[in-house]
Amino acid sequence: MSFLDLPEGLPERIIQCNSPYTVRFGVRLRGRMYSFIGWRSVREHCEPVKGDIRYASNADAEEVEALAALMTLKCSLVDVPFGGSKGALKIDPRGWTPQELEHITRRFTQEMNKRPDRARRQCVGSDIGTGEREMAWMMDEFRRANPTDVVTSGACVTGKPLSKGGIAGRAESTGRGVQFAIQSSLRDTRTPGLDGRRNLKGASTVIQGFGNVGYHAARFLSEEDDARVTVLAERDGYVANPEGLSIEALKQHQIRTGSILGFDGAKSIAGDMCGVEQPCDVLIPAAMENAIHAENAERMKAHLVVEAANGPVTFEADEILRSRGVTILPDLYVNAGGVVVSYFERVKNLTHIPFGLMERRRRERGNHTIATALERMTGKESPADMRDEFLEGGAEIDLVRSGLEDVMRSTWTRIADLMEQQPELGDYRTAAYVASIRQVADL
């Protein structure tokens, strides 16, 4: 708080969580009663509050409150009008059938509906252990609890299936945001870049985690930016190919076998957690908290560390890496793509109009006029594939990606500008937190 110059008492008010609470409930399953415990934490500096719901056997109240604070600052940083919240249910979803999970999810949602942050004041989404299926169940329960509020009840949940009011591009949004974050930082001449390079072409990239975020980030960076993803690490080991991994083939192998190990297109190293220590230009920890810590930070051989997971670099590791000249893009910024597209989904649900519906054909006709005029002026016909791409009016996913890129680029500019104005901040993480907290303080 020393860089902020806030009025007396305001820092304490910002730190406080408005509504941390515990829910306990029972569900009759398998001929007996099972008891469950969950938590929800709400920070109401701005409404509605946005917070994803995770199902994890190691969840606890302290983690939920910390993640709610992180969501508050993340929304503030990217200028999304949400307060922060978080929810968790202490459960291993793999131990229950889909039918049992539905009963549990609906009861959990009913308990949350009894609380003061119900319905239009909240916006939940998916996280670890939850997905489109669970979000559809939750939305249905919110609607049952608020039968007269059919206009806004669908907007209380994001990450829904497209058929239930979801939005194109939500599944890829965090990984896509990682790509835009890297592009934005490299494009900025105030950053060191990658040995002077301002793009990812040929850049060796190591990614820890091959779930939703890691997969999409790897795919987009390799297919669209020509990066070489040389190492992919998971819990049971890592795979490596100095020429670059085939991401789609590796994903299909993981789906078939349940592991990335044994992939034909790479060398597999089982049981070794040193994948993140392999030499590379870009290191993307996209799996777990505290993946880079004081004991292994000295062995990192990356020029740029991109925090796609929440809290993957500890405080001590951060200091070690920066003392060695490593640039770190902070999680508060890098993984904000998910909440940005969740905001787009909520807007879509509130307006009940898909993005692009009102202008797609008008834009298509305008592009057709331009293409025809150019062909007449030059006397040459455009190649069919180029013409078709140019004439495309813009599907919903194109508009979602465009909006996300704009948010990530403008947010990076805010962070870099603040670093330039206040060099004493020292690093991009501190600059991001200062920019975010100032915005919260102004609300």
Curated annotation (Swiss-Prot):
The lineage of its organism: Bacteria, Pseudomonadati, Pseudomonadota, Alphaproteobacteria, Hyphomicrobiales. It catalyses: L-glutamate + NAD(+) + H2O = 2-oxoglutarate + NH4(+) + NADH + H(+); L-glutamate + NADP(+) + H2O = 2-oxoglutarate + NH4(+) + NADPH + H(+). It comes from the Bacteria. GO terms for biological process: glutamate catabolic process. The active site is at K86. Keywords: NADP, Oxidoreductase, Plasmid. The keyword DNA-binding does not apply. Belongs to the Glu/Leu/Phe/Val dehydrogenases family. This is Probable glutamate dehydrogenase. InterPro entries: Aminoacid_DH-like_N_sf, Glu/Leu/Phe/Val/Trp_DH, Glu/Leu/Phe/Val/Trp_DH_C, Glu/Leu/Phe/Val/Trp_DH_dimer, Glu_DH, NAD(P)-bd_dom_sf, NAD_bind_Glu_DH. Gene3D superfamilies: Leucine Dehydrogenase, chain A, domain 1 (3.40.50.10860), NAD(P)-binding Rossmann-like Domain (3.40.50.720). GO terms for molecular function: glutamate dehydrogenase (NAD+) activity; glutamate dehydrogenase (NADP+) activity. Its EC number is 1.4.1.3. SMART domains: ELFV_dehydrog (SM00839).
